[in-house]
Amino acid sequence: MIARLRADVIASSWTTDTLDELLSDGALSALMRDSRLPALVELAGVDAPAATLTRFFIGGQPERASALDAALPTLGAAGLETLGLAATIDEDEAASALVMPRPCSKSAPKRERAQAGEGEEASFPTAPALPTMRDPDEEPEPEVVVDPWMRALYDLRPHAAALPGGEHEWWVTSDLGEGQTGKPLADHHVMGIGGATRTLLEMTVRDQVDSALDVGCGCGIQALYLATHARRVVATDVSARACALTQFNAALNETTIDVREGSLFEPVEGETFDLIVTNPPFVITPDTVRCASGMHEYRDGGMDRDNLIAAVLRGAPDCMTPGGTLQMLANWEIPASRNPDTQWSQRVDEWLDGLPVDAWVVQRDVLDPARYVDMWIRDSGGPLMVRADYERAYTSWLVDFRRAGTGVIGMGFVALRRLDEAEAASGGRRAFDLSLDGHAPRGHDVSWALASLRGPELWDTVLTRASDVREERHYVPGSPDPELLILHQGGGLGRSVPVSSAVSAVVGASDGELTVGQIVAAVAMLTSVEADDVRAEVEAPLRDLIRWGFLTY
């Protein structure tokens, strides 16, 4: 029956391109924010199969069985029920769920207006119903609903992926969100494709590999992407419901994924992979909130504080092939006693100690406890909770952070590369970057950043400035020398980086002809500065600029 569903959605042209044609940019943007009403207004009265499916599965609106039969002629409404994707509802439930306004007249009935002397012909009163001929002792015949109302039990929507190996159009099933149900999320809720998911999808390295692992697979979208460039894909999740949805989505999209239930790396003990991706349930949640509001499996791994991230980082190397990569999103606590700008990395650094990996760690944002709690409690439909329950959960969360001495929570990502035996003997190398302004890194940016940690000897390297790098100079009026120099990156990470005049000179001369050592010697001679002093000034900034893609070798 899944094959029939697939055939029908393809035949109905229910694709992202069709959604672009059916909906305005504003309505599409609203859907990305989980706001369905603009789309429902624009699709009202549109009979196209794609419009029906969008209203039903994405907009959460009831539809008549006949409309679903027309949109899915092979599977039909009955097939949706058999698959567990939809259910029949009565007229009252449908009426309460429909959001489009009903026709309403505030004028008096025609007969009353005529009696009031408005010159209209009076209507005849309605005749009473005819008496029944049924025997009073006879059981009444059950009412037959010819065209019942149906409601979706899951979110199903098209998703397009443009990848190095080609373009793909998929259909992805997940649990309905609070915007569709009007209720807080259930403990076992399986998320669809949200903002964090898209971030990880975009930053994943898409090189062809033999094996890939998705830890905490949720609805399975990461695994679908991995299957386009990995010969073998394994997906794991502690949630049985998530595993079932991943299996369903794999079948719907004719993709082979080995789905296993279990926590983190337990289901793949003894196996290794060339690429591991994970958007783990990292939200720092106190036991008091779990007891009062339940444990939302999609965001809460059940561990104390931010120890889930430590568990992933410490367990990953045993499941990585030499040269293999891990990419993950993460949160970490920064104590109030530490400076969040200069000491944020200490906790992550401790987790990485002794591991046979190189690491690139980026903190993209920080939130104070109140903003962190507000974000995550709203994410699960908190405002739809009973007010007293909402406020108790909110305050319990804040009290927990206060007792733990948490100043802010860092949010970012970690990329690891597994070292071979020879590399591991000299220890792993790490780079910590704070707040990468500009563009979110793509897969090739991550791959380059990790590779740059093991680049050639700097002074003997011939560097080439990226073609999109430009320099901005700020002068005090009348001064011959610039007060501020900023390098701008048009592509790549899109960063803007203040630099010294010496760094600017080295970057400017890096045209693929001379080594860095030769350029430094020339800069030292031109500026009458000792070469060792120039080296000391430019070494760290040049390594950063290489990692960020301003310079290549």
Label every PLM stretch briefly.
Residues 1-52, 91, 147-152, 157, ...:
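Acidic, low-complexity/disordered tracts enriched in E/D and polar residues
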Residues 186, 194-278:
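Conserved SAM/SAH cofactor-binding pocket of Class I
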Residues 238-239, 304-363:
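Conserved Class I SAM-dependent methyltransferase catalytic core
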Residues 369-452:
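Flexible, glycine-/basic-rich loop-and-beta segments that form/coincide
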Residues 93-112, 118-212, 217-225, 229:
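SAM-dependent Rossmann-like transferase core, predominantly class I methyltransferases
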Residues 240, 280-311:
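Mobile active-site "lid"/loop adjacent to the S-adenosyl-L-methionine
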Residues 49-103, 125, 129, 133-135, ...:
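Long, charge-rich, low-complexity alpha-helical segments
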Residues 331-338, 364-380:
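Conserved catalytic loop of SAM-dependent methyltransferase domains
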